[in-house]
Amino acid sequence: MAGVLSLQFTPKSGDKQFNLQKVNEIISEYSDKKLDLVVIPEFFSTGICDDAFINSPEDVNGGEVVKFLSETARKYNTNIVCGTASERDGEKLFNTAFVLNRSGELIGKYRKIHLYNFFGGNEGTY
């Protein structure tokens, strides 16, 4: 039987450190369940906030959030799929999902191509 943990919480908009700590607390709470996969929601690190999306993107080779996810995957011996975080590649910003294995290796990522532009969302602007 596979152990899967799907996180749901309200991130503090623009407070990356608080949000990463919250993710760690939730995973820690369930770590005795032998988790095979942890799924983290979209914009978990910054909340849905245009300023945070623009001003604190991940480096294309992995920044603070990817390093945190890598350490967390190793610490809890689990695979992680994070919804999305902003990622910078040159001058472009992307809404990117990251996949890490139990060893903390970044084994995949997906950049959204159909971005949210209705009901006030502005992802397509970037």
List where the protein language model places each region.
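A short, hydrophobic beta-strand-centered structural micro-motif
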Residues: 62-88
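Catalytic metal-binding/acid-base residues of hydrolase active sites
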Residues: 10, 44, 85-86
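Residue-level recognition of beta-strand->loop/alpha-helix junctions
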Residues: 8-10, 41, 111
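Active-site beta-strand/loop signature of hydrolases that rely on acidic residues for catalysis
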Residues: 19, 27-57, 73, 80-81
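Extreme N-terminal starter segment of soluble prokaryotic enzymes
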Residues: 1-6
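Active-site catalytic loop in hydrolytic enzyme cores
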Residues: 88-126
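A short acidic, glycine-rich active-site loop
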Residues: 56-67, 125-126
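N-terminal phosphate-binding loop and adjacent alpha-helix
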Residues: 8-28
